[in-house]
């Protein structure tokens, strides 16, 4: 049995932590879903201005989370497997999504003493209704993976590189430049980054330059932070400092590839952290399903963690990072409990005449 590639378990854990931190920045502080609340009073003190720069850097560092998660998926699923096995995995994932959607909505409805049948229907059809945009895209990639793997296996290294080049042109976009996410191309973008992960698995890039990809990731994020922060603090035309966000298919595409390549070049760690990452790997997706549920999101960022109340405190960054770690730990613990309880349910007994029927 081949040794487990624990560096990718660690990267999967890190990428989900980045997703949670990114949600703190863009949901908890910037309030991207409620633009009328976009005002952030960073500029009212020197400490607040420092925290603005740190928050902008945190947002850009964590912008890569979804991309890296899909690249990891591509790395492991680029090996051909039957559609039946992938379908079964997709069904189990769909049932988990429905479970959390319905359970969380039911608890919220009981607390509010209100019930909306249309909202319940939305929770029962999470993929079709795109309740979770990321999970909708992930499910599509999962079901397409056997066919993408067969295609990738049939390509030479050069052909694979040309395919990635074409997909880069078709998917890269920044503001008014490029295709961006139009005409339903977000799924095409996920196919692109899935195939990037697959390319690393099949063709294993090598060379001394890989050791510098981690530095390229950090320096690019620092440079972008400097550009965004300095331009606003010196030349801003609005009364508030605005946290800049970037689409996953612009600069974060480059930084996510850099981070993924750097991790792929590392030896598999054997530390306690890596061991914990391996143990928690089956529960990582539950972090997204729980904390990003529409009923949990506002409660989490606006009423429990409330990051905007700490913008002028010196410990703001430590508080934000610690709060996100607690969110992850709680979500993982909840899913561990769910699986423990479900394991206590006895399996369905086979029909007494099943063997006889099978022999006919």
Task: Label each PLM-derived region with a short phrase.
Residues 1-167, 270-273, 303-360:
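Membrane-cytosol interface segments of multi-pass membrane proteins
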Residues 70-78, 193-200, 287-289:
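Hydrophobic transmembrane alpha-helices of secondary-active transporters
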Residues 159-206:
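Loop-centered beta-sheet repeat module
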Residues 207-286, 292-303, 307-320:
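Alpha-helical transmembrane segments and terminal signal-anchor/GPI-anchor hydrophobic tails
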């Amino acid at each position: 049995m081949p040794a487990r590639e624990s560096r990718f378990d660690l990267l999967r854990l890190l990428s989900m932590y980045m997703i949670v931190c990114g949600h703190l920045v863009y949901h908890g502080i910037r309030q991207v879903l409620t633009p009328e609340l976009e005002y952030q009073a960073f500029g009212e003190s020197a400490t607040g201005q420092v925290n603005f720069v740190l928050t902008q850097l945190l947002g850009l560092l964590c912008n890569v989370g979804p991309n890296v998660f899909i690249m990891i998926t591509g790395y492991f699923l680029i090996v051909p497997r039957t559609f039946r096995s992938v379908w079964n995995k997709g069904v189990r994932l769909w049932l988990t999504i429905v479970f959390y959607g319905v359970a969380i909505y039911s608890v919220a409805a009981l607390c509010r003493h209100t019930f909306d049948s249309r909202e319940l229907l939305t929770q029962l059809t999470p993929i079709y209704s795109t309740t979770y945009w990321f999970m909708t895209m992930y499910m599509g990639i999962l079901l397409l993976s056997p066919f993408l793997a067969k295609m990738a296996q049939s390509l030479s290294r050069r052909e694979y590189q040309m395919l990635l080049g074409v997909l880069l042109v078709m998917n890269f976009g920044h503001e008014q430049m490029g295709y961006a996410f139009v005409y339903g191309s977000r799924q095409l973008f996920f196919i692109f980054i899935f195939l990037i992960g697959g390319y690393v698995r099949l063709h294993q890039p090598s060379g001394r330059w890989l050791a510098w990809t981690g530095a390229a990731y950090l320096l690019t994020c620092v440079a972008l932070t400097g550009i965004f922060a300095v331009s606003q603090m010196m030349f801003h035309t609005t009364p508030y400092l605005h946290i800049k966000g970037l689409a996953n298919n612009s600069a974060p595409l480059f930084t996510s590839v850099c981070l993924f390549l750097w991790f792929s070049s590392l030896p598999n760690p054997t530390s306690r952290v890596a061991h914990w990452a391996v143990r928690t790997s089956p529960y990582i997706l539950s972090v997204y399903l729980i904390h990003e549920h529409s009923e949990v999101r506002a409660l989490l960022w606006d009423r429990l963690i409330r990051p905007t109340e700490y913008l002028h405190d010196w410990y703001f960054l430590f508080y934000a990072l610690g709060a996100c770690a607690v969110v992850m730990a709680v979500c993982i613990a909840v899913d561990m409990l769910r699986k423990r309880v479900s394991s206590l349910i006895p399996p369905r007994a086979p029909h007494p005449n099943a063997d006889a029927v099978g022999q006919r």
